[in-house]
């Protein structure tokens, strides 16, 4: 019986071959095809843990991509890498750019909130309760937006908002 890794590699390769075939026959401009190929290569590098290579591919994709939804997705993936690398400020900045391109990405808001909440916990551990409240309030603000965009999708966040007293009555409006 093949290992899960072998099966996953086979699926990845099969998907790549199918995607390449579709891209070749699609009636889209060459520029858009190249943007997609850079994006796809960036995603593959990111999945393999080669973050610097992934960022390079994503940057190339952004130079060519004109579709706002696709640009937002690319920027979101870049922000995830920055977040993984501990570059929180750059991650927040990139998530915000992703939201400018496509405001309907609740995961961007969720992840910004995670950074704010982490900073709040850090302030709390250091005894700075005023700073804690500032960061927790910022987390609540972006998390409330995420929950409005994706009701029921972030139950842990909804519980945090409720338990921390930062939930508003209109959260689902």
From Swiss-Prot:
Gene Ontology CC entries for this record: plasma membrane-derived thylakoid membrane
UniProt entry keywords in alphabetical sequence: Membrane, Photosynthesis, Repeat, Thylakoid, TPR repeat
Family: Belongs to the Ycf3 family.
Name of the protein described by the UniProt record: Photosystem I assembly protein Ycf3
Classification via HAMAP family: Ycf3
Subcellular location: Cellular thylakoid membrane
TPR repeat extents: 35-68, 72-105, 120-153
Pfam families noted in UniProt: TPR_17, TPR_8
Its biological purpose: Essential for the assembly of the photosystem I (PSI) complex. May act as a chaperone-like factor to guide the assembly of the PSI subunits.
Keyword Membrane: yes
Native source species: Prochlorococcus marinus (strain AS9601)
SMART domains with a match to the protein in the record: TPR
A single GO BP: photosynthesis
Membrane topology: Peripheral membrane protein
